[in-house]
Structure formats: C-alpha cells, structure tokens
Amino acid sequence: ITVTIRKQEDVVRARPLLRQIDPGAVLAEEGRRFDLTLTEQTLRARRAAAVQQSIEVVRRRIDETGLREPTIQSQGSDRILVQLPGVKDPERIKRLLGKTAKMNFRLVDQSIPGADLHTSRAPPGSEILPSDNEVDRFGRPLLHLVRKRVMVAGESLEDAQATIDQGRPVVSFRFDAVGARKFGSVTQRNVGKPFAIVLDKKVISAPVIREPILGGSGIISGRFTTAAARDLALLLRTGALPVPLT
C-alpha cells in the first residue's frame, strides 16, 4: 500500500497512525510517501487464519442443511476439502458454499434517476450496484445507486429465519444490541428515504423507511421463492466467509 501525505507538516502525525494499520507490516518512508508492505510471515498467518475461519463457516452452513458426518478439512495452504456422503442435492450445497454472504445495510443515493444509471457514473461516495432479483423492461438487472458508507454491517445480525408475510416468502432478521441501536438511530433520521440491503455487492431489497425501526428486527422482502428465502436465512445465520470460495 502506498500513501502520500499532502502536507509535509502532517507527516509526523501520519507516521504512528500508519504503523497502527498492521503491526506485521514493514513501513518505508521517503519524503511525504509511505510504503506499507506485509511480510511473508504475516501473509502466511493471515492465509491460515482465513482458511480456518472459512472451515468454521462451511461447517456451520452444512450443519444447517441437516447433513450428517461431513468431512471438512484444510488441504494445503489455500484449499478446503469437503466430502458429503449421501448428499441428495449437491447443486444446492455448491450454491450455499459459493456465496461469501457479506451483507450490509446502506442508504440509497437519489441524485440520479434509476432509468439513467446504465449510462451514468456514480458520484463520489456512492456506487452503482445491480439488483439480485429484478430486471428492467429490457431484461437487464435493475440498477441502484447506493451510498458506500455502511449503516449497519451484517456482523450485527443475531438471527435470520425464512417466514411468510402477506402470503409471500420473506426473511425476518434480528440484530444484536449494538446493531439494533445503530439501525434504530439511522432509520429514525431517515424516515421517508429508501435504504438498500446489499448481499455480495448485489441489492436484494431497497424499501422505503416508513417509520423508525427501533425494535432491532425487520423483514427482507423481495421476489423470493420459498427455497431462496430459506437459503438466504441460512447464509445470514451462519455468517460470512472471510474470502470467496471457488
């Protein structure tokens, strides 16, 4: 990572802050430029930690499907071996393990009409993301202009369940105490504005905040089948993978 400090007088203040980014990195300095490089030892340790964390998430996801006696173990430095005797729907398991499932809640940027997003560039602080389950009249994924700043991260989700609301499959969710406070505060300040529920860089729902959501729970609605709602709830309950699996 290369960082250039704009003002020479800020270099002294920046130095200790940059060192705090990663104790396992080497910091080289030249004038107003700093180069932060991870050592091979640090990279190996991070890779091993990511594999171990991925194994734990994979095990939770498989356990939630009801499969018994799976074999899940690391193979080399960057592979995970998964053996599932008697699995009846291997494609579903592949889909579940192939999703990183990084979820967050963000505000929608309404500065550009949705119809213009296919030919527009996102303003600073926002990005254009495709819908996970909706298309426009040309058959293209519907686009959303979404703020980059995360309101509440998926790590604050405490539980998620597939259920039925007004005859449609939905996913109900509940935050932990910290997430509930953040979500309540943000929704209180943004009544009448749309917010996006983003999963793996795709918008799965973008409802309007009708009133403050202070109870720490809510519902994700979309064009879900019963099976899709069930699998989404499973992914949210079991947590996100630290890295994508291919």
Locations of regions flagged by a protein language model:
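Non-transmembrane, solvent-exposed regions of membrane trafficking/translocation machinery
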Residues: I1-I209, L214
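Extended, hydrophilic extramembrane loops/domains of integral membrane proteins
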Residues: D22, L199, L214-T246
